[in-house]
């Protein structure tokens, strides 16, 4: 009898232990998720335009400045004698798509760094005094990677053409210039909203990150790289006689300006951007391998950037036609790339 009671007691103790460990694991899991949320996810949720906490922050903090990497202020808040705040953009349209705007849902850095701009790291005693006196704290500033001179050069070079210019520091990936046209004046975005956001207007569209265009001859870099990958020991022996065009299976590719480049190796074909030679190379390499190479080079993938962007598109297989293969390998066909990519 005593043994049965002892076994029953031992069984109950095991049950209690299992329940205790179960709730302990749940508790530890909640703590782990809380820490993960605070370190990784909190800024994203707080920065969401749908988060009403932002309105609370805005009531207590004067939005911080946005500057270029070389110290030029490109967005700031001006407060008049009555306490009315106005967001000012000293350079107007020049930084429009990069900086964005802070109204109507926000865009650009104003949107991506909204939480930072509305968060204040003023000295805590200063914040206490401000709270008592009803004075707003000064928000944190955002220092961008943009270079003022590079941005100005890109803006002036694009002039009145529709298109985009983006300059990236190759060693770090820092964006030093980003221009998209048509553009808008962020200083008057509220008054101009119906015009810039109306049917037929693309002024709000950031072509630098969201535009998709045929890459043209720049794609020959990938065609040449795939040829080198497939023929690492013999690529220097490549030779092609260009007479301004190439015809295969009834389809013809012409060189720019119908120019004849004569006898070329791979280097000369690349240097002269010879369409005929690269169409010929395209028929030599394996389409499936070229497709794999392009996927490795971030085609068909989202670029890791906080700005709204579109993925570059590439698709080519060994079952595709000769015509499509030739077009694709000179940067035409169905291939689309974003200026960011």
Please provide the spans of the model-predicted regions.
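Periplasmic/cell-envelope proteins involved in peptidoglycan metabolism and beta-lactam response
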Residues: 1-193, 203, 212, 238, ...
């Amino acid at each position: 009898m005593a043994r049965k009671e002892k076994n029953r007691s031992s069984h109950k103790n095991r049950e209690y232990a299992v329940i205790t460990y179960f709730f302990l694991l749940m508790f530890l899991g909640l703590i782990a998720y809380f820490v993960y949320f605070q370190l990784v996810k909190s800024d994203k949720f707080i920065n969401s335009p749908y988060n009403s906490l932002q309105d609370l922050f805005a009531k207590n903090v004067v939005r911080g400045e946005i500057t270029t990497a070389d110290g030029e202020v490109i967005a700031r808040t001006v407060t008049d004698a009555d306490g009315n705040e106005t967001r000012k953009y000293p350079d107007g349209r020049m930084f429009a798509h990069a900086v964005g705007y802070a109204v109507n849902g926000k865009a650009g850095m104003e949107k991506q760094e909204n939480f930072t701009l509305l968060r204040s790291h003023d000295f805590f005693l200063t914040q206490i005094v401000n709270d008592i006196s009803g004075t707003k704290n000064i928000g944190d500033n955002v220092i961008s990677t943009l270079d003022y001179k590079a941005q100005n050069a890109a803006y002036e070079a694009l002039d009145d053409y529709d298109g985009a210019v983006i300059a990236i520091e190759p060693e770090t990936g820092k964006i030093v210039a980003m221009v998209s046209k048509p553009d808008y004046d962020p200083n008057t975005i509220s008054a101009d909203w119906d015009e810039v956001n109306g049917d037929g207007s693309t002024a709000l569209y950031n072509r630098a990150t969201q535009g998709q265009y045929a890459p043209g001859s720049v794609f020959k870099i990938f065609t040449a790289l795939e040829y080198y990958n497939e023929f690492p020991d013999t690529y220097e022996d490549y030779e092609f006689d260009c007479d301004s065009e190439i015809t295969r299976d009834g389809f013809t590719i012409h060189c720019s300006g119908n120019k004849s480049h004569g006898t070329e190796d791979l280097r000369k074909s690349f240097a002269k951007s010879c369409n005929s030679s690269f169409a010929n190379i395209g028929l030599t390499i394996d389409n499936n391998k070229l497709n794999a190479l392009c996927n490795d080079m971030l085609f068909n993938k989202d670029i890791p950037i906080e700005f709204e962007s579109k993925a570059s598109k590439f698709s080519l297989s060994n079952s595709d036609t000769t015509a499509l293969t030739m077009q694709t390998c000179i940067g035409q066909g169905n291939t689309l790339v974003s200026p960011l990519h």
